[in-house]
């Protein structure tokens, strides 16, 4: 209710945040990921406003994945596992990050927020030398750099990403912001001009199949035949339902233990009233 304000708007598309170490790249991303909330007056972030559907994505080694289609990023695994219906109790960095992206899309996100510091390197990029030594047909991982433009153009999902070590994303970014002593400035033209001297050594890929919006979740075995299900809140880090722990440590947009409690209650309600293996 304070009238018009001025500032830097980040357009839809693929946006890269770059800059030297300790110049504020991750700080800006952190402000954006918490911009899905209203802030108290005087907080300093009142006008950092982010798309309400924005999801922070990171690698999450060891997480569980159940029947998720990660074939957009992972295919032809040596063990023969079907990546269109992928399940594991101990995901790697790349498979966990692939699943996190796909699940966010299934949930209806329009914006992914990523930081290279918390991402799996082999999920994000493969440099030219590695591609020459390990040919594409021998590599089951399609790196995010090969899909990020497609996510926006075909699926309407934008990406804002922090990068400090590789300039490869200059080629696919629509907008490039440099943080200089905590001050952002648009260097898209400069970065694109410099990138022309370092062309990407990769051929365009055909579009991948999008996420499955018709999945029909089934009730967890931990709830079957149980009338009284105990829900224990483990602070902001997670909840325990019938002694099955749901680890929320890497869901970085959660800000309070009460949110963990609310999520536990939502899961209990869904398990008892909604999940029947027939409805999506």
Task: Describe the residue ranges of each PLM region.
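Conserved NTP phosphate-binding and transfer environment spanning the P-loop NTPase/kinase superfamily
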Residues: 153-156, 162-280
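AAA+/P-loop NTPase substrate/partner-engagement loops
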Residues: 35-75
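Conserved helix-loop functional segments at active or binding sites
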Residues: 16, 34, 38-42, 103, ...
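Flexible beta-alpha connector loops of hexameric P-loop NTPases
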Residues: 63, 71-94, 125-141
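Conserved alpha-helical scaffold flanking the Walker A/P-loop in AAA+ ATPase domains
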Residues: 92-104
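Conserved P-loop NTPase nucleotide-binding/switch module
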Residues: 104-148, 152-153, 162-192
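Glycine-rich phosphate-binding P-loop
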Residues: 5-37
């Amino acid at each position: 209710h304070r009238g018009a304000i001025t500032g830097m708007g980040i357009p839809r598309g693929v946006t890269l945040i770059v800059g030297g170490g300790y110049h504020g790249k991750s700080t800006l991303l952190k402000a954006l990921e918490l911009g899905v909330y209203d802030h108290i007056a005087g907080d300093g972030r009142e006008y950092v406003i982010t798309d309400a559907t924005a999801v922070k994505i990171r690698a999450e080694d060891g997480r569980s994945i159940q029947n998720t289609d990660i074939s957009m990023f992972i295919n032809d695994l040596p063990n023969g596992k079907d990546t269109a219906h992928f399940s594991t109790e101990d995901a790697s960095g790349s498979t966990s990050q692939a699943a996190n992206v796909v699940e966010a899309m299934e949930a209806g996100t329009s914006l992914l927020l990523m930081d290279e510091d918390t991402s799996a390197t082999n999920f994000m990029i493969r440099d030219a030398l590695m591609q020459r030594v390990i040919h594409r047909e021998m590599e089951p991982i399609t790196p995010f750099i090969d899909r990020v433009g497609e996510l926006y153009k075909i699926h309407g999902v934008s990406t804002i990403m922090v990068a400090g070590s590789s300039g490869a994303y200059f080629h696919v970014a629509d907008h490039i912001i440099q943080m200089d002593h905590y001050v952002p400035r648009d260097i898209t033209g400069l970065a694109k001009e410099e990138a022309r001297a370092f062309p990407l050594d990769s051929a365009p890929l055909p579009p991948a199949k999008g996420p499955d919006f018709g999945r029909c979740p089934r009730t967890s075995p931990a709830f079957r035949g149980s009338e009284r299900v105990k829900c224990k809140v483990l602070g902001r880090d997670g909840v325990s339902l019938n002694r099955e722990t749901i680890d929320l440590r890497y869901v970085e947009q959660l800000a309070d233990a009460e949110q963990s409690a609310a999520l536990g209650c939502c899961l209990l309600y869904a398990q008892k009233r909604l999940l029947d293996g027939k409805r999506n």
